[in-house]
């Protein structure tokens, strides 16, 4: 089980090789971002695409960014699609990546079902909840 960062100049190829499934994750963002917009952000190097591989097969895709905040540096998983791949099996590799990038935290954006799973299996804890109301 390894995480392979995809260079920004290889995003188009990765998209054709299956990373386009990240559009599914974008659909749960409440209109914040589309799959095409995510591809553009990745191509510009603003976030990093990770290929999740096991036994020489791609089993999932994730997108991360480093957030340098005033009191901490965090690796934030913004998008993830790994159908039945067990993302938690890749978590040690993700923590190692975060440490090598100088991060002291790993954060993720997710829905309630994933939040429960990540709390139980990976030790995540809620930091805050973001709510919104649409204006006319």
Question: Model segments located where?
Answer:
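Active-site rim helix/loop that mediates acceptor-substrate recognition in acyltransferases
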Residues: 28-47
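Conserved catalytic-core motifs of GNAT/GCN5-like acyltransferases
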Residues: 125-136
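Conserved donor-binding loop and adjoining core beta-sheet/short helix segment
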Residues: 44-85
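Structural motif
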Residues: 42, 54, 96-98
């Amino acid at each position: 089980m390894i995480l392979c960062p995809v260079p920004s100049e290889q995003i188009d190829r990765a998209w054709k090789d299956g990373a386009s499934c990240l559009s599914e994750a974008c659909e749960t963002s409440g209109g914040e971002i589309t799959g095409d917009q995510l591809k553009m952000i990745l191509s510009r190097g603003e976030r990093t695409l990770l290929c999740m591989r096991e036994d020489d097969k791609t089993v999932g895709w994730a997108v991360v960014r480093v957030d340098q905040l005033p009191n901490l540096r965090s690796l934030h998983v913004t998008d993830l699609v790994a159908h039945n791949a067990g993302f938690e099996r890749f978590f040690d590799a993700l923590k190692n990546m975060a440490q090598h990038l100088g991060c002291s935290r790993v954060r993720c954006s997710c829905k309630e079902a994933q939040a429960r799973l990540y709390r139980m299996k990976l030790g995540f804890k809620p930091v805050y909840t973001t709510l919104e109301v649409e204006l006319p």
